[in-house]
Amino acid sequence: MTDTANLPHDDYAAAVVHALTAIGIAPDQWWTETPDGQQLDAVIMFDENTHDAMDADAWPAGSFLGWDQHAGWALVEGAHVRNVNPLELDAYAAPAAVAQRTRDRLLAPGEPDKPVAEAWDGAAALEEAVKAWEAA
């Protein structure tokens, strides 16, 4: 698929950004893309100099939240370091769950994960839209 005007995960990424902003972690920037026409990516950037909601010692180079339809969500250290920390959530987890797990990991890395409500009523529709996009 090469049409990048409207990707099936655009609204999902926007919902995660909204959920992050609602709990005080507004990203510096974010976007969706398909780098190869096969994988769908969402990138949500955090700058260590602009966020009190981040343990600067644990994330000295900042971090970004990444998503793809196969691996799901992960926090990645810095723009160049690439230490990948999966959020251990379903690939189509509730935006509020993604936001809460991200906040917990940014504030207290290494601590046990708190339970979050992963179920999301938009998951099935998003997964179907992604499958249709992959098949096109």
Give a label for each model feature:
Residues T2, L20-T21, M54-D57, G110, ...:
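Alpha-helical interaction segments
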Residues P27-E77:
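Amphipathic, interaction-prone secondary-structure segments
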Residues A79, N83-A136:
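Acidic, proline/glycine-rich low-complexity IDRs
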